[in-house]
Amino acid sequence: MSYVLDSTATRHNLDAMAKFYLNYETTTYEEVAGKGVKQITFNQVNLESGSHYAAEDADITFRCYELLKEKLSQKPELEKVLSEIDLPMIKVLSEVEQNGALIDPEVLRIQSNNLGQRISGLEEKAFSEAGKEFNLASTKDLREIFFEEMNMPVMKKTPGGQPSTDESVLQDLARDYELPKILLEHRTLAKLKNTYTDSLPEQISPKTGRIHTSYLQAVTTTGRLSSADPNLQNIPIKTEEGRMIRNA
């Protein structure tokens, strides 16, 4: 209901809604259970604190529901979106999540090995281009090689006044220099390997043999679905490597 009324809001959890709609500060879970390594489970919380927390949650949930229901009743077009699209979609998405996505781990393993070989080859090319070995992930090393040893132009600086080596700078420099081009390709392949070909097989459920992502209805400002744990919607489609991962 909160999302349908305002999809641009950054948060739609109970704490945020209580603050925005009721001007009420809720008791946080950390206040009753602690945080970090010292956080306890809810069944270990003392009865008085736990009862207050649970009762407050129920009370604020009901109050927000009544208020949002009233607001929606004043906007029939949004009320229709909720009743005819968003709520029925919950059951559909639940079934999709439970069914999961069938993944072939052997295909991903082969792709991971291939990517690993290409990444190693790019590292050797980078070392050859620079005339020495260096840490491709080290901003300090890149600054030293780019701007001190190879005299590349400084395209922009960081807030701290240091020459930037972010992706936009690498893309600009790659027009005239080989090393930034190699680094961009290395980063692209390393991300594919770490995020997908290495990670996805580890997220296959041993019970179903499938990956069960979560589809989120109330996150994007445009109303489209998003995916998390893992994000299966973010696998690249424009590159050959991304399409190969999708084929798995």
Regions found by a protein language model. Give the residues of each.
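Conserved "right-hand" nucleotidyltransferase catalytic core of DNA-directed polymerases
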Residues: Y3, T8-E240
